[in-house]
């Protein structure tokens, strides 16, 4: 009955063990250290012929034919071509017999000098041994997964660790590779399996006098708690995706406000063209930065203005608007000197400030994720009435808050010309990035991949249907519960019908 119900969830999805390779004929080898000249290079060999490779490349005097090779021991040896007997190099090898190795197979690592010729000739010599071949991309890790040394989330964590360019990325990837995400999802899966076991027992053995008639309600309450936990995990605000790909920061504002100068200053190189000619930046110029360990993609955009007939510039402005709206943090630059000069010329400074339509149109782009930057503060020193400038700033910020219904707004005054307050701006960015990446629930790992979110969303939908069917049809409710188990199991690729059977036999003593 139980097996029949499991198979009825989806004819194309039968819960089963992940495929494992019992016999792998090929022994694979490749360079595990970085490509190029180096002091030491490491060549990894994995598979049934790994021990043969050792004995073929060394002389009998180093390791006797009948002598057992010491495992996890660095053995100094001279390596030779097995066909020509020509010396290849003098180095070390470390032997990792199955199953206590990275791949779960017999593995040997040759530590040799990192010259190109040494690496090439050693690889060529290994390839002469029958049953060996160069590995495909990621094949060592694939074998580790297939042999149960890593689950899918740990494999992805290893991939993220290799790609990590900031300390925060490295920290999260390392935790994932060591099983933090696996533990979290396997714990949820275990709770779902236990609740499902109660439901299955009630359906199949409901007439048994020893079964508590409230078992369905107990299972339902347990599922509500699990569902809420998963939903809370889903509401992580895209922190995990930002961690892997980088937080998007857009620099926007009117032409010649100093956007390109700012990005050049932040990157310490000439990433954007700096010119007094309005409309110089047409495309979005993106630069990847590490700000206090947080990965950031910062983009310089076209100046926002209405008075242009240049079709290319108009398209660039539209791209700037789109980038601004889809950014995690927005830096909006005003040209302090130009802004104050216009008001000095056009109105009595003792009256209230009236902003023209062009400036007011810029207000629409500002929201809670925006930092308003008043650039070119060094040029304001030529004015005598700087108190009026302070009034102007307050008036401007107040207008923006009222126009966009904002409770508060972040602002700072800088000069890209003499680096005034640039450190303060960086500190403000660090604070915003910290809030952006902050993990609210310390027990809940970050959702670093879209597929996790999809499987969890499918799981929540199944649990919602389960809660509905609990009131109408317990058999259908049970099927939805098993569908939820399947969805969450696909994250780690750990799907096993025996887990459910073990719970049933353990908790309900069916055979007595």
From Swiss-Prot:
Keywords, comma-separated and alphabetical: GTP-binding, Mitochondrion, Nucleotide-binding, Transit peptide, tRNA processing
Q: What is this protein called?
A: tRNA modification GTPase gtpbp3, mitochondrial
Q: Which residues bind GTP?
A: 253-260, 300-304, 375-378
Q: Which GO terms describe its molecular function?
A: GTP binding; GTPase activity
Give the range the annotation lists for the signal sequence.
Answer: none
The answer, when asked if Repeat is one of the entry's keywords, is: no
Q: What does this protein do?
A: GTPase involved in the 5-carboxymethylaminomethyl modification (mnm(5)s(2)U34) of the wobble uridine base in mitochondrial tRNAs.
Occurrences of domain TrmE-type G (ranges): 246-434
Q: Which GO terms describe its biological process?
A: mitochondrial tRNA wobble uridine modification; tRNA methylation; tRNA wobble uridine modification
HAMAP family registered for this protein in UniProt: GTPase_MnmE
- Where does the record place it? Mitochondrion
- Which InterPro entries does UniProt cross-reference here? G_TrmE, GTP-bd, GTP-bd_TrmE_N, GTPase_MnmE, MnmE_dom2, MnmE_helical, P-loop_NTPase, Small_GTP-bd
UniProt gene name: gtpbp3
Q: What is its main location?
A: mitochondrion
